[in-house]
């Protein structure tokens, strides 16, 4: 297992948060997601939270650490009246920067907490899904839908606030490989991750620390690795070494110390035979804002009908009557 850090390089998202009121028009980055017109002077009730740095993103490119805002991403901010406000717009496509328009009044403080609860979150409530899915290898566009989240303290003054968004979940990056010819003919259909404690459920982003709090009961996550076209039956297992492009899969979990059992479900569609290969990992501290390489050599031992002997026997137990012989007695 190899730990990779999101800090600064990856998931510490730097953003410029400019508080601009009625006379600030939006740039071409603005993409309205509601009936609010974000390009007129009628927006006196909106504040602009502008993501300025190229590192301000929410989906992951593993190789170079590049992140991007994805379609449907929203941020939440609590205003001077203590009211939760969701950005009235969101990107409609993958983008490196974006200007979020947020309702509410933000003039009483030089610090405001910014929340990204994921695409399916609300305010500071986050759900890490027990059922996760990825449509193609080495894709992270799904992580915001299954529990990726983050918080930041926006600080500044005179209408300009800067913040660095820290992601509060941990991500497991599964990279199975095999040298077994039979397994190379199979497809990876799903990955089951089971913990000795909770790794999935509904949590709260603490309004002081920004970290995930609360106790959920979910101890198992199933990642389905199927999409369309060449991935309709699952991800290939043709690689003899770890290779993200072939079958890399990203699973979001609650950070913490977990002992994990991982079951790789594979299927040979030619014979319609399927099964699971199990790997265990001792207790380890999976920290927030980090991702972890979970490489695994998945293999099976092939016992043919001639490998069963009684003590000190000269011939195998089913000699002449193996399951694959002309006169089989051996059960299968």
Give the role of each language-model region.
Residues 2-332:
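Sec-type signal peptide cleavage vicinity
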């Amino acid at each position: 297992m190899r730990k990779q850090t999101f800090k600064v390089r990856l998931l510490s998202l730097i953003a410029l948060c400019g508080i601009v009121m009625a006379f600030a028009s939006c740039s071409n980055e603005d993409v309205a997601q509601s009936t609010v017109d974000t390009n007129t002077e009628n927006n006196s009730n909106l504040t602009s939270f502008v993501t300025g740095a190229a590192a301000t993103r929410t989906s992951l490119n593993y190789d170079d650490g590049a992140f991007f805002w994805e379609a449907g991403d929203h941020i939440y901010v609590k205003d001077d009246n203590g009211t939760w406000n969701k950005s009235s717009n969101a990107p409609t496509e993958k983008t490196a920067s974006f200007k979020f328009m947020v309702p509410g009044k933000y003039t009483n403080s030089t610090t405001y907490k910014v929340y990204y609860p994921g695409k399916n979150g609300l305010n500071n409530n986050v759900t890490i899904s027990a059922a996760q899915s990825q449509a193609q290898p080495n894709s992270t566009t799904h992580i915001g839908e299954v529990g990726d989240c983050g918080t930041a303290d926006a600080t500044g003054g005179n209408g300009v606030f800067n913040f660095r968004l820290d992601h509060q979940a941990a991500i497991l990056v599964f990279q199975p490989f095999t040298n077994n010819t039979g397994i190379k003919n199979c497809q990876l259909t799903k990955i089951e991750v089971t913990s000795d404690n909770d790794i999935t459920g509904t949590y709260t982003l603490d309004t002081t620390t920004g970290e995930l709090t609360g106790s959920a009961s979910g101890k198992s996550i199933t990642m389905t690795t199927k999409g369309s076209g060449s991935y309709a039956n699952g991800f290939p297992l043709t690689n003899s070494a770890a290779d993200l492009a072939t079958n890399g899969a990203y699973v979001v979990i609650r950070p913490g110390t977990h002992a994990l059992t991982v079951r790789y479900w594979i299927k040979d569609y030619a014979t319609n035979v399927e099964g699971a290969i199990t790997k265990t990992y001792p207790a380890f501290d999976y920290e927030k804002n980090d991702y972890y390489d979970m490489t695994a050599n998945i293999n099976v031992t092939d016992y043919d009908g001639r490998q069963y002997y009684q003590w000190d026997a000269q011939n195998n137990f089913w000699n002449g009557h193996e399951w694959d012989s002309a006169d089989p007695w051996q059960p299968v």
